[in-house]
Amino acid sequence: MSIGKTPPRGETKYWTNGKYPWVSISDMSDYGLVTTTKESVSENAKSLFGEISPAGTLIMSFKLTVGITSLLNTSAYHNEAIISIYPFVDKNYQARNFLFHILPIISNLGDTKDAIKGKTLNSKSLNNLLLPLPPLNEQRRIVAMIELLFDKLK
């Protein structure tokens, strides 16, 4: 897991000639795919961020609007209200897809704190979330059932 960062807004060197997508919660949608972002950061911002989150990464909001999950359609950086989750334990992304659906439920059961603008999970409460992790075959079955139900809602 890795928590994002926001470059200083007053320093234009990070925001001018943006080359890399920068995700904020407003770019995410419940159970969605982040394909575009409202903002991007420059080459100068790379030194602040470290590794970019690759396409396919599961991201989740944990501040203000706790538990929104999305998948990155492209490599991107993100702000400090979002966490990248790397459950790449299998080539078919079964664990990632399972967490994509289960984390919105589990994260809202966590020890959230009231902040000025809404609920938030801190690093300790994120680490203390108890996640049910059935075997990969069972995760695949659960995800298939959830996606079938979502398809019926469309």
Give, region by region, the residue ranges found by the protein language model:
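ATP-grasp fold ATP-binding core
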Residues: 23
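Catalytic cores of nucleotide-enabled group-transfer and carboxylate-activating enzymes in metabolic
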Residues: 89-95, 132-134
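Short beta-alpha junctions and helix-cap segments that line functional grooves
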Residues: 9-11, 70-72, 114-116
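A generic structural signal for residues embedded in beta-strands
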Residues: 60-61
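A short glycine-rich beta-alpha junction/loop motif
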Residues: 76-84, 116-133
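Non-catalytic DNA-recognition/assembly elements of restriction-modification systems
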Residues: 1-6, 30, 128, 132-154
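Sequence-specific dsDNA recognition surfaces
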Residues: 1-12, 26-55
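Short, charged beta-turn/beta-strand-edge "cap" motif at the junction between a beta-strand
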Residues: 64-68
